[in-house]
Amino acid sequence: HDADNEKLQRYCSDLPSTPQNLRLRALVALFLFQGLRQIEVVRLDVGDIDLRNKTAFIRGKGRDDKEPIHLHPSTVRVLREYLNCYRFRSGALFRSDSNHCRGDRLTTKSVREIIKRVFAKLEIDGSVHGFRHFFISKLIKSYKGELLMVSKYSRHRSIQMLEVYNDEII
């Protein structure tokens, strides 16, 4: 997985900085460096991103309340480029650029399709959820199995769910 993620990062950074490619880089950063769920990414609004304080406010799975997360420096950089390009002031952070629904909020299905096309091009066998799995596995390793800390940073309510990841790693 490390090699695939490095290949994906290299591919994204080598792309010309077109609006579509900037959107792809931002999506990949939120999945890879933040471990966000697909639903958390598509629910993001422009107002949820605070680049000055390097935070984002995430509306979790099945929740209406938003919780702050710290943004990785790479995520801050690509989000800044993305927002400077699109100049969105409010509303959905990620929007469709297809002809029949241009400007609408991206759906989880459309995000999966975007990522699936890139994976196919790079011959990566994976899924969008694989990013989250990778992120959580990294957290478990860096916190040496301290699942309370991992649950905080992964926004996993269930320690039992994290034990599944932990058992795979240890």
Predicted features along the sequence, with ranges:
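Conserved catalytic core of the tyrosine transesterase superfamily
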Residues: 1-170
